[in-house]
């Protein structure tokens, strides 16, 4: 078995050469059996694959019985330098009997970003035409995709598959604004299972024309995403506007093998509360309630910091705090009662972002540390 966890990472400006049988992802290629593969709280930005096939970001190639979990990631302007007849996905699922959970991710592409305004319509369409989808599932192998709480804006298409059988697809509470229903799967139908699917073209008969791209460009803002990546976090993300239809529109829970794949926290450490889960990697927090953001220093009750590789928790109140250390995906790694000061051995903790959740019976404080 092969087990891989990738967290709090940024993959930017990578380019893979011509597609071959040994390459399926421009950034990450996973090939294994009977293992677990996790990518969380990461951003894939401006990566490209020189191919008519493969994937612009992540490829599962010839593996089997792999359980994959992709959550709280941002896929931003990844593309292909090839000339595909359809679209090249950010995520490619091949192999057999793999179960892939894709939850609370943000997929964004500005179709005109690399085009020249002086180009003719035909030349511009050559640029636009070679754009990407979100996920492509191979037609054989009995793979399963659970696609939940994702926002897809500006890509050519969302979930595609060349076959109606030999795969399991479940789509729930996704918000998609795409060019066309290319390879459209019925599981992502607009209005079904909380899904929203808006397309700039009614059908994908013939090549897109300039008017189709104009329609999609006009639709880009409808999801209420801030178009530029935010830089106030180690991992860049696309923030959400207050009036966005993504706010509170996500599913609280979706179980795969009795495990909830909806992450407990968003990409910056904000707690997702039942009944108020947003779609996408980022959880909107109203300016009037900033204490929901992990890592804020607004409270004088508790101080959390890293010293000599250890996590130090200082309680500045008379009441004891019940303190939990939680990984960004919700897994608890330590718990204790803190009356005054506690020093947690960093060598016993996983590296990366940890959320320190403290509760004294009357208030809860969440802070973020990085080991």
Question: Where are each of the predicted segments found?
Answer:
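Solenoidal tandem-repeat scaffolds enriched in leucines and small polar residues
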Residues: 2, 15-19, 26-31
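Parallel beta-helix/beta-solenoid
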Residues: 2-12
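Residue-level signal for short segments within beta-strands and strand-turn junctions
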Residues: 13, 46, 77, 109, ...
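Residue-level recognition of short loop/turn positions
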Residues: 72, 104, 149, 243, ...
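Surface beta-loop-beta hairpin patches that serve as ligand-binding interfaces in beta-rich domains
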Residues: 235, 244-290
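C-terminal outer-membrane/trafficking sorting elements
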Residues: 294-371
């Amino acid at each position: 078995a092969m087990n891989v966890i990738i967290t709090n990472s940024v993959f930017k400006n990578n380019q893979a050469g011509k597609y071959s049988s040994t390459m399926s992802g421009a950034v990450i290629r996973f090939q294994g059996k009977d293992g677990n593969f996790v990518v969380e709280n990461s951003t894939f930005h401006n990566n490209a694959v020189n191919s008519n096939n493969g994937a612009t970001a992540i490829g599962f190639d010839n593996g089997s019985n792999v359980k994959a979990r992709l959550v709280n990631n941002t896929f931003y302007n990844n593309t292909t330098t090839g000339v595909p007849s359809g679209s090249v996905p950010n995520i490619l699922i091949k192999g057999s009997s793999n179960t892939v959970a894709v939850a609370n991710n943000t997929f964004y592409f500005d179709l005109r970003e690399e085009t020249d305004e002086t180009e003719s319509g035909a030349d511009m369409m050559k640029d636009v035409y070679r754009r990407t989808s979100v996920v492509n599932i191979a037609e054989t192998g009995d793979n399963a995709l659970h696609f939940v709480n994702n926002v897809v804006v500006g890509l050519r298409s969302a979930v595609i598959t060349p076959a109606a059988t030999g795969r399991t697809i479940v789509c729930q509470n996704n918000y998609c604004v795409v060019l066309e229903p290319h390879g459209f799967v019925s599981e992502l139908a607009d209005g079904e299972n909380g899904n929203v699917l808006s397309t700039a073209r009614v059908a994908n008969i013939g090549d897109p024309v300039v008017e189709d791209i104009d329609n999609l460009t006009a639709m880009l803002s409808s999801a209420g995403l801030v178009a530029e990546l935010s830089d106030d976090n180690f991992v860049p993300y696309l923030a959400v506007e207050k009036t966005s239809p993504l706010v509170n529109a996500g599913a609280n829970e979706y179980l795969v093998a009795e495990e909830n794949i909806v992450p407990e926290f968003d990409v910056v450490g904000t707690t997702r509360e039942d009944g108020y889960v947003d779609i996408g990697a980022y959880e909107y927090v109203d300016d009037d309630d900033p204490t929901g953001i992990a890592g804020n220093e607004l409270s004088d009750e508790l101080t959390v910091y890293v010293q000599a590789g250890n996590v130090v928790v200082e309680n500045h109140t008379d009441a004891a705090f019940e303190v939990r250390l939680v990984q960004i995906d919700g897994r608890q790694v330590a718990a204790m009662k803190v009356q005054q000061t506690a020093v947690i051995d960093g060598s016993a903790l996983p590296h990366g972002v940890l959320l320190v959740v403290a509760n004294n019976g009357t208030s809860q404080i969440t802070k973020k540390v990085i080991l």
